[in-house]
């Protein structure tokens, strides 16, 4: 590639330098790039505004609408081919029932999530294929329909007499992940009466829990 690894200080800094043997080395304008691991998005934003970082792809969600309104030249929003989603553990007998999984999906207000939680130009996704992608777009979708969600949960056998067991949302350490999880926790509680526990783990523990 255009750069070679020079140094790697764990949890401190990674330095890469220009690779003179790269096939198009004359077009590589940077001699070095320094990468800094910053776990807190507010800290990263302050470092960027103070000139300690030249580029950051992480922005506090509450700052994004302010930068958009100010037409801040430092902010660049480009299309991103990706979908934010949750995986459900179907080894759990409760979540094995497709009616339960549909109920959980129908009770999430995706438009509210992008307008009030993420707030940085995201588009509600009603299928796994990202919105606006070329090629096949499915006709079916899962809109926000709390009435249907409640009916599906009742069909699955859950009611006031037979309450739904507590669910757990596992997310890795990130303020934006926490905000999304908190919003979904509230939606499932309000629309379905389901109690949800939020569990925050650092990345390594998060991955081990998913295995």
Predicted regions and their residues:
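Surface-exposed, Gly/Pro/Thr- and Asp/Glu-enriched linker/hinge segments
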Residues: 1-5, 26, 31, 62-63, ...
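Append "and occasionally in soluble cytosolic enzymes with long acidic Gly/Pro-rich linkers
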Residues: 4, 15-18, 24, 76, ...
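Periplasmic binding protein-like
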Residues: 54-55, 187-211
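Ligand-binding "clamshell"
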Residues: 65-77
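Short, hydrophobic alpha-helical packing/hinge segments within bilobed ligand-binding/sensory domains
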Residues: 43-45, 53, 64, 100, ...
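Periplasmic-binding protein-like
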Residues: 74-88, 132
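Extracytoplasmic
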Residues: 11, 28-30, 70, 81-83, ...
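Ligand-site clamp/hinge motif
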Residues: 20-66, 202
